[in-house]
Amino acid sequence: LECIVEVNTNICNNVNEVRKDLKNKIAEVQEIANKNDNEIISIGTHPFARWKDQSVTNTNRYLDFLEKMQWPVRRLIISGLHVHVGVESGEKAISITNGMTRYIPLLIGLSANSPFFDSELTGLASTRTKIFEGLPTAGLPPLLKNYSEFQKFMRTLKRAGTIDSIREVWWDIRPHPSFGTVEIRVCDAVPTIEEMVNIAAFIQCLVVGFSENYDEGRQLEILDPWVILENKWRATRFGLDAEIIIDESGKLQPLKECILETIDKLLPVAESLGCRNELENLCYIVNMKKSPYIRQISAFNKNNQLTDIVKYFIDELKVHNTVHYD
């Protein structure tokens, strides 16, 4: 949609480079927006903008999507945070993609930032997740045995006319052969640059941890698809207050506890990557209940005004502001 701006970083070696890149580019976007009497926010769904009033970007690609899919595309007034992490081979990318699926609810819980849609409090922490699942090639990735099976699947989708390229496969996590990466796409857009960097660090640590296990021949733990799907729903609905299933017997664990345990296990990896502080920032957000969707609802509750959410998030994204998640 024309109301959405996509900001891409360059290839970065570490999260400090990501932070610097984002600050520079978002500052540039803000400057251009301000010159045209506009402001920008980073949010999963705009709290009151009407999707019926938005214009689709006038390019052949997006107009083709609209013609092909109709209503599911027209209501895509949503924004996400996508993170690419480089991996050495297609086989490793498939293994990591399979292993990462169990962490989808953690990523939703940490990033959930869309409790309002079309002026309505939806009852979901991440409304964006359910809207995006309306696309025919979105949602959980299938569990694939190897890279050859992935290639065969892509060829089949092309031959059937379902897609023209991998760019039209909108799984929550996907191998990206053109970039040599695993791309994590499940997160809502989060309000601040620091939160973007924190989540990118968490994702990088997960992927690097899986990569090391793969290199050492250790079997990656994979949950049954029904468990992953149920956990995704629980995080979408309840955010950090969700209880998720941790094994096939139905044993439950609070999502917040699972996130903190996962971060603790990843600290050695974070130390080696130079991003321990970023993971500790996530612990603070979890412990203090400062997740973005909670901040949205708090901003609204002060005066019952949806415009207060937008004003608050405009300020949060200002590059030179220090955000205290209050």
Regions found by a protein language model. Give the residues of each.
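Glycine-rich, mobile lid/loop segments that gate access to catalytic sites or pores
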Residues: K92, I108-F132, G139
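Short, low-order "capping/linker" segments at domain edges
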Residues: W51-L63, T122-P136
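Helical (often loop-to-helix) elements that flank the catalytic cores of nucleotide-handling enzymes
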Residues: L22, T59-K68, V87-I108, P191-Q204
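Acidic, His- and aromatic-enriched active-site or binding-groove loops in soluble protein domains
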Residues: T59-G80, L143
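C-terminal accessory/tail domains of diverse enzymes
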Residues: L1-N36, F65, W71, F132-D326
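Short, glycine/charge-rich beta-strand/loop segments that flank catalytic centers
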Residues: D37-Q54, D118-T122
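An acidic/histidine-cluster motif and surrounding catalytic segment
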Residues: V83
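Short, flexible active-site-proximal loops enriched in glycine and acidic residues
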Residues: A33-H46, W71-I78
